[in-house]
UniProtKB/Swiss-Prot annotation:
Encoding gene per record: MED26B
GO MF, one example: translation elongation factor activity
Function: Component of the Mediator complex, a coactivator involved in the regulated transcription of nearly all RNA polymerase II-dependent genes. Mediator functions as a bridge to convey information from gene-specific regulatory proteins to the basal RNA polymerase II transcription machinery. The Mediator complex, having a compact conformation in its free form, is recruited to promoters by direct interactions with regulatory proteins and serves for the assembly of a functional preinitiation complex with RNA polymerase II and the general transcription factors.
Keywords recorded for this protein, A-Z: Coiled coil, Elongation factor, Nucleus, Protein biosynthesis, Transcription, Transcription regulation
Region ranges (Disordered): 71-111, 263-376, 408-436
Protein name per the record: Probable mediator of RNA polymerase II transcription subunit 26b
Amino acid sequence: MKASGSLDSWREYFRRRGDSDIFGIIDHAIMVAATDCPNKFKSRRDKIAELLFSCRVNRCVGCDHLELSVPGDDEANRGTTGNGGGGTAVDEDYEVAGGSKESKANSSRGDNNQIVSNYTFDEAEALSDEIEEFSVVSKEVARIKEILLNKEDEPNSVLLDSLRHLKLMSLNVDILKSTEIGKAVNGLRKHSSDKIRQLAKTLIAEWKELVDQWVNTTKEITGAEGTPESANPSVLDEEEAFPSLPYDVDIFTPEPNGFEISHFFDSLDFDGNPRNSEEHNTSREHERRPQNIAKRKPEGTQMRIQDAPFRSIKPSSATDFDGTRRPVKQSTEQRMKNETVSVHKSEKPMIQRKPVVTEQKRKAPGPQQEKLKGLDADAKFEFAKRKLQESYQHHENAKKQRTIQVLEMIPKQGSAQKPQLKRPGMSNRNWANGRK
């Protein structure tokens, strides 16, 4: 503790100034020290700030006297002389304060002598009473536990009184955990006496509810406080992990490619073989012309017409009355052969007609070309438009003729005459009429 004589001397020193405020003196003293002794003030201001936050008034243990507790008081008092002069005590106090930078590393020296209790006398007395009560209750519960464990040797009245005593006692979770009284009471839940059995079940239910409430409260407190960073492994992993490289997102984006699939297919012929550059350019020019559309359309229609007989053919549903299915299969096979032969015959005129049309297109009269040369752009456009419509009409007529020929060649399914069955009743009736 700080010597009372040093504080009294300084108290008298400040009181001589009259009605001056002590806090005003402190403020002005700091200003004067910072102005007159700036270097020394810088070296000591850390200790001054530490002194401001470390000074506290504590109540002495054993009496109600208030004492000032300042770290490093004992060392300062050891260095003071026996004359009790206030000036020397204060100077040595400041010497200790100024030399505290070395003592920060050795601040743990003599901590047992410098520790001052932060509890007041009433708090310390209440704490001691609580500890004493805990020990007394624990001893009583341990005594009752021994009685309950020896339930075979004890009468029912003693067991019942022990359980009632436990019910009247206010037990907490610490006592239940330290004494393990729950195991002893749980063994009485199947006792022969109804009162003992019922009282044991009641105690177990109350203690279980108490423990559940304590667990829930603990979880809520820990959840509110939050887990420390050391308990969170992800934080440690992030700190110990290598720093991530500053990747640029644009590096991973694919470069734009100007190659189009349409150009790839244009460079191939119908068989999948690559064309020459000249053939590729000429094919591109022919595709742009409208005549190519007129040439391709009848080909698709011709293929559709050729496939029509095969799609329209259905197996005959005629059945043989003799019960055997073999003649039915033979008849369907013969019919399919006849239809294929007729289709092949119908294809011959179509194949012969195609070159005729192309030859007619290829043969263009010379005077007609000369007339086209003399016309302007609008007249040429109208002429090409009329020719295109005529070619469309020609192909439509050819398409109708082919469909009519194919439909005439397909045999009608309903034309086959079904054999007439003779009813046995009619023959018997005729036979009876003949006898008459």
